[in-house]
């Protein structure tokens, strides 16, 4: 079974406090709330000033090719609070990079560490990846802490 079939099998999965699913266009309001706040995506992409920009970003970057991209949802609040995805997934070399972001009102509560740890485990156990990495901005110490708490080693 190839990695794309395995990713399709894991379109939906969960942890203790979170569930992961493909993005829906109905996420646009939650996505815009997240993407229009410059603190949330400071190291990722420019702030989405208008709802139309958020609609475009959601459709083109998160929905167009959904395998390996998940909306992170809070089970209790039943809303989308972030995203986690594979960047540069190489099916032949069996390696990938993980990218992620989270609403700032969910920061420092272990949510992203929970999300990254789960995807790390799935990557090795189910998707049979041999190498996984997280590339962070040099000044993004919060993301570096998430990576380290999730078992990744910091290289500079």
Q: What positions do the PLM features span?
A:
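Acyl-donor (CoA/ACP) binding surface of acyl/acetyltransferases
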Residues: 1-42, 69-156
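Conserved GNAT-fold acetyl-CoA-binding loop/helix
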Residues: 39-60
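A short helix-loop-beta-strand connector motif used in the catalytic cores of GNAT acetyltransferases and
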Residues: 59-71
């Amino acid at each position: 079974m190839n990695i794309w079939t395995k990713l399709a099998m894991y379109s939906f999965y969960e942890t203790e406090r979170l569930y992961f699913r493909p993005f829906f266009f109905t996420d646009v309001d939650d996505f815009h709330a997240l993407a229009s706040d410059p603190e949330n995506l400071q190291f990722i992409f420019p702030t989405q000033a208008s709802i139309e920009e958020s609609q475009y970003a959601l459709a083109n970057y998160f929905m167009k090719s959904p395998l390996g991209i998940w909306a992170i949802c809070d089970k209790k609040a039943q809303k989308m609070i972030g995203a986690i995805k594979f960047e540069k997934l190489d099916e032949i070399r069996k390696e990938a990079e993980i990218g992620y972001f989270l609403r700032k009102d969910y920061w420092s509560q272990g949510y992203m560490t929970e999300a990254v740890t789960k995807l790390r485990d799935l990557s090795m156990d189910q998707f049979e990846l041999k190498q996984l990495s997280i590339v962070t901005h040099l000044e993004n110490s919060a993301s570096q802490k998430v990576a380290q708490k999730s078992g990744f080693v910091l290289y500079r």
